[in-house]
Amino acid sequence: MNKTKEITSVTLAHINDTHSYFEPTSLQLTLDIQGNKMMPFVSAGGFARIATRIHQLREDAKRMQRSFLFVHAGDCFQGTLYFSLFKGKANADMLNALNIDAMTLGNHELDMGNEPVAQFAERINFPLLAGNWDLSAERANKAHRLSENRKVKAYDTARRCANWITKPAGDSQVALFGLSLDKMADIANPDSDTPFVDALETARNTIDEIHRAGINKIILVSHLGYQADKELAAKVDGISLIVGGHSHVLQGDFSALGLSREEAYGQHINETYVVQAGLHALSLGHCHIDFDEQGKVVSFQGRNELLLGRRLFLDASMNEAGSDSAHLEACEWVNNHPNVVVCKKDPEVQGILLNKYIPRVRELQNQVVAQASHTRRHVRIPDDEGPSQLAPLVAQSFVHAMKNRGHPVQFAIHNAGGVRTSILPGKVTVADIAGKLLPFAVPIGVYHVSGQTIADTLEGAINNAINNGVEGTGSGSYPYTCHLKFDYDAEKPKGERISQLKILLGSEWQTVEAHQYYCGTSSAYTMKGKEGYDALLNMKDEGIVTNVSMADAFIEVLTDYPDLLSHHSQAALTSSSR
C-alpha cells in the first residue's frame, strides 16, 4: 500500500453469492443496436475468468504502487452440483485457487448445520469472518470444532465484539471484520450451541475496539443484505467501506444489455461507501480507495464488471456462434460496454475443475431419469395461472422415499422456496434435479403431530408468505402438500383461517381430527420451525432426520415412476390444496 503525502492507497476487489457457480453461465442478453433487436447468449463469469481478471487487477495495483485486497462477502455453498456432490470441498479448492484474503460467512453456508462449515474452514487458506457468531459454548464432543480453528474470526464474548484481521497499509493498518445475519436461526440451520448475536451492537463495539488498537481504516465484509448494509452505514460511524452480499444486487447500469439497472456503484452514506457485486460469479466489483491519516476516504472510484467470453451465440447451449454481420457488430458493441470486460479463463483454475470435479459433474449431467412431456411450472404463491405444478410432486416424493424406508408417513408438507425452478419439456437429468430444481442439500425427516398442529402449521406458513398479520420472511414459506387438502380464508381471525382440512388415508379423504396424531414428512429445515412453520416444534418427541436429501427423494420417485412428468400422470396426483 502506497503512502504519499499521508494518503494510503488501496485497491479492493470483491465477489459475493457465488453459490458454487464455478463454471461460466449461459447468459441471455437483450440488445437494441440502432433498431436491430436481438437476444443472443454469451458465456459469462465463472471462477477461471475471475482468476484472470484478479491477476490483471493485482498487476495494475502493483504498477500503481497500491496494495490489493480481494474478499468474498458470503454464500459460496449451495446452488449447483458442485456443492451437491462435493459438500464444500470444491468450494475450498476453488476459493484457495483465487487466493482471496478473506470471506464472510453466509446463511447458505449453514443450511446443513455447522459440520460442513467446520470441514470447509479446515480446508481453506484464508480467514472466515463471522464476527457476530458466538462459538464460546460450542459442544466439546464435536468432531470438527469451529471454536478451535484460528482461521474462524468469530465473536469475542469478553470484549463483545468481532475478532478482526489486519492488512499492512504502509506505516499503518487496514482492519477487516465480518458480520452475518443475526436472525440466522430463522432462515438457516446453525447448531443450537452457536447462536448469532446482534449485528448492529457488534459493529459498534468492534469499531470501538479497532480504534483502541490504533487503527482507523476499517472495512466491513457483510452478509446482512443491501438495505441492512445501508442502514448500518447510516447508524454506525467509523466504517470506511462495507462490502456486501446476500441481496444479489449488481450495482450499476447494465440495462443496455437487457440486465438490471441498480443504484450506482459505491453508495456514499455517513462517510461510508457501500458496494455489492451481483451473484453466481457472473461479475466482479473493484474500487480504488484513498484514505487520509484520520482514516477518512478522500477518494473513491470503482465499478462492477460483467466478465464475458468474446463471442455471442444463437442458442443457450452456446454451440452455434452468431457469425453474420449483425451479430459481429453486436459482439463488438457488447465488448465495448463500459461495464463489460472480456477475459480468457485462467488455465490453472480451469485445470482444477477439469481434473478434479468436472468429470463427475458431467456424468450426472448426462444421466437421464425422466422425460417431461410438457412444462411443469413452479410458482411460490398460487397466481392467476394456478399453484405450483412441481412443489406437490416434490412433497409426494418425500412420502414415497420415506415409505420405501419403512416409515409410516401419511402426508407431506414442503415450503415453496425449497423448489428453485420449473421443469421444461424434454429430458430431465440428475443434474437438473440436484443442481437446479432442488439444489439445497437438505435432508428430509419424519415426525408425528396432532391434527391441530397440522392446521396451525399450514396457517402459520401461509400467514408468513403473504404477511397476513405477521411480518413474514418471504413468499418461500408457502406450503405445498401431499395427501392433504384444505381451505384458507385470509379474512378470518388468526387461528381460524384453515378449514375443511382433510387427509387421504388409503383411498378415502377423511377429516383431520384435532387431537389425533398423524405421521408427516418435511425437510429438516421445515422441521426446525423456520419461516412460519414454528407450530411443527410441537411435534411428538424430536422426530427423525434421515440421510435422504430432497433431491435424492425426487430422483427416487422419478426412477420408480418415470412417467410421473408425463401428461397421463396428472390424474394420478393425490396431492392438493385449495
What does each of the following model-derived ranges do?
Residues 1-308, 390-397, 412, 448, ...:
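Acidic, metal/ion-coordinating pockets
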Residues 2-24, 29-43, 51, 278-578:
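Catalytic centers of hydrolytic enzymes
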